[in-house]
Swiss-Prot record:
Cofactor: Cu cation; Zn(2+)
An annotated Gene Ontology molecular function: superoxide dismutase activity
Subunit field text: Homodimer.
Residues reported to bind Cu cation: H45, H47, H62, H119
Keywords from the named record: Antioxidant, Copper, Cytoplasm, Disulfide bond, Metal-binding, Oxidoreductase, Zinc
Protein name: Superoxide dismutase [Cu-Zn]
Enzymatic reactions: 2 superoxide + 2 H(+) = H2O2 + O2
InterPro entries given in the database record: SOD-like_Cu/Zn_dom_sf, SOD_Cu/Zn_/chaperone, SOD_Cu/Zn_BS, SOD_Cu_Zn_dom
One Pfam family in the UniProt entry: Sod_Cu
Lineage: Eukaryota, Metazoa, Ecdysozoa, Arthropoda, Hexapoda
Organism: Drosophila teissieri (Fruit fly)
Binding site for Zn(2+): H62, H70, H79, D82
Name of the coding gene: Sod1
Length: 153
């Protein structure tokens, strides 16, 4: 059974991101567009809570149900919500195209109901040596976010 979800991002960065997964055994395809980004890399993460009552700050930390350190999408030791970076050219829109085999739209670890956050700076993928590298990727301010909701198939 295919599951689809959508996230409308608001803030200084704005856009729409779609999620699609064919089954619980297949990767999630993430696609969409974001505007309002400066040229360069921007951290792109799923955060724990679907709470945006205090803007992006109330979405909590990266979604990390297994208590791992921050890492790159290809790392075994990473938060489930660590989706790496999206690259902006400085022109609108910035395209989002990610395929990830760790996140899911099924079961207890589903990202549906959680928040996507776009950050001001590049995610150093846990390798930067900064005090925040192993927790946030030192990706800077939260400049856009939205709750992931289930979408019509």
């Amino acid at each position: 059974m295919v599951v689809k979800a959508v996230c409308v991002i608001n803030g200084d960065a704005k856009g729409t991101v779609f999620f699609e997964q064919e089954s619980s055994e297949t990767p999630v395809k993430v696609s969409g567009e974001v505007c309002g980004l400066a040229k360069g890399l921007h951290g792109f993460h799923v955060h724990e809570f679907g709470d945006n009552t205090n803007g992006c700050m109330s979405s909590g930390p990266h979604f990390n149900p297994y208590g791992k350190e921050h890492g790159a999408p290809v790392d075994e030791n990473r938060h489930l919500g660590d989706l790496g970076n999206i690259e902006a050219t400085g022109d609108c829109p910035t395209k989002v195209s990610i395929t990830d085999s760790k996140i899911t739209l099924f079961g207890a670890d589903s990202i549906i109901g959680r928040t996507v956050v776009v950050h001001a700076d590049a995610d150093d993928l846990g390798q930067g040596g900064h005090e925040l590298s192993k927790s946030t990727g030192n990706a800077g301010a939260r400049i856009g976010c939205g709750v992931i909701g289930i979408a019509k198939v």
